[in-house]
Regions:
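Short, solvent-exposed loop/beta-turn-alpha elements that line the ligand-binding surface or hinge
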Residues: 1, 49-59, 82-115, 145-175
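Append "and occasionally in soluble cytosolic enzymes with long acidic Gly/Pro-rich linkers
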Residues: 1-26, 129
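Soluble non-cytosolic domains of exported or imported proteins
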Residues: 10-18, 41, 96-103, 117-125
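Solvent-exposed loop/turn segments at secondary-structure junctions
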Residues: 10-15, 43-45, 72-77, 148-151
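Sec-exported extracytoplasmic/periplasmic mature domains
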Residues: 24-34, 51, 55, 73, ...
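Periplasmic binding protein-like
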Residues: 29-90
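Surface-exposed patches in mature extracellular/periplasmic domains of secreted proteins
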Residues: 34-41, 122, 140, 145
Length: 175
């Protein structure tokens, strides 16, 4: 039986077009028995499918797609406790868009971030437990991410950014 993946993709998107060539039409995937069906749609519709938003239309509440190509900006705060929450109220707020309900993964994600800042060894141990369980479940398969760079005129003074300091704070300090 082949692995069939239903892919919700945004229309007029160069990355989606590249993924068609690299994934959907990849002869190695075809040989392995993997079939990827792309459905191109507007970004708003893709989000309705991602969040299973039946308030927009009952069809969105029915799990249909198991692949979405959306970029992510990785933050320096590696806190996944809500990303893999099994709590119904968190899911209603838009967390756990993978709909992977695994108590062990949720607990590992929570344990990882609930240690005191000076407990580095405990954090490392918990991180390994989380990543091990994450790899067993493989709820996400990252294909690409955003990387941000700042380019500015050398006349600009006090433009100091970091992964911890947002754009709005940076603008306020610059002149």
């Amino acid at each position: 039986m082949p692995l069939e993946i239903k892919w919700a993709s945004t229309e007029n998107n160069e990355v989606s077009d590249l993924l068609v060539v690299k994934l959907a039409e990849n002869p190695d995937l075809v040989k392995a028995g993997i079939k990827i069906q792309r459905d191109a749609m507007s970004f708003d519709e893709l989000l309705n499918w991602l969040y299973r938003d039946a308030s927009q239309d009952a069809k969105y509440g029915v799990p249909t797609y198991n692949m979405f190509n959306l970029a992510t900006g990785f933050t320096p705060w590696y806190d996944q406790k809500y990303t893999y929450s099994t709590k119904e109220e968190m899911i209603k707020m838009g967390y756990n868009t993978n709909y992977i309900f695994d108590k062990e993964l949720e607990q590992a994600a929570t344990d990882m971030v609930m240690v005191a800042p000076d407990q580095r060894d405990a954090f490392k141990d918990n991180f390994v437990k989380f990543v091990t369980r994450w790899n067993e479940m493989l709820p996400d398969l990252p294909l690409y991410s955003n990387q941000y760079h700042d380019f500015y005129n050398s006349k600009l003074k006090h433009w100091v950014t970091s992964e911890m300091k947002g754009l709005t704070a940076t603008i306020l300090d610059a002149w």
